[in-house]
Amino acid sequence: MPSFDVVCEANMVEVKNAVEQANKEISTRFDFKGSDARVEHKENELTAFADDDFKLSQVKDVLINKMAKRNVDVRFLDYGKIDKISGDKVKQVISIKKGVTGDLSKKIVRIIKDSKIKVQASIQGDAVRVSGAKRDDLQSVMAMLRKDVSEAPLDFNNFRD
């Protein structure tokens, strides 16, 4: 019985590349000369450092621009509060969302059940497994989910025949 998983996770290699490109641009830009502006990447977390709130927003703009060029959806980013550190410097922790949340997985299952397509959807941890008798049904479910679920970037993986 064919099946696939609906997941919500960023390509971490592309995130790392986007952070490196953003840091490279920040280090060469004229308006950041002499400032300690940078973006650090650790596991599922990014930390943006800057001299003040304005420069922090500029750092985030550069990061978002580089992520968009690397085809990383910015809806994966969850911005924390801005913290003041030594002197006038500020930092902001940006966490990278991973996995389908409980509410979103329930919404996905409800959309699939309401569509009356002959597939079964089950929540499995941070993914939703969709299985059905025909591959065409699964492809129509994928198209429907791409159209109906806009609050999170969905990926489909773990295809089985």
Swiss-Prot record:
GO cellular component: cytosol
GO MF annotation: an example: nucleotide binding
CDD domains named among the record's database cross-references: YajQ_like
Pfam families: DUF520
InterPro entries the record matches: DUF520, UPF0234-like_C, UPF0234_N, YajQ-like_sf
Keywords: Nucleotide-binding
PANTHER family on file: UPF0234 PROTEIN YAJQ
HAMAP family (alphabetical): YajQ
Similarity field: Belongs to the YajQ family.
Function text: Nucleotide-binding protein.
Protein name: Nucleotide-binding protein H16_A3060
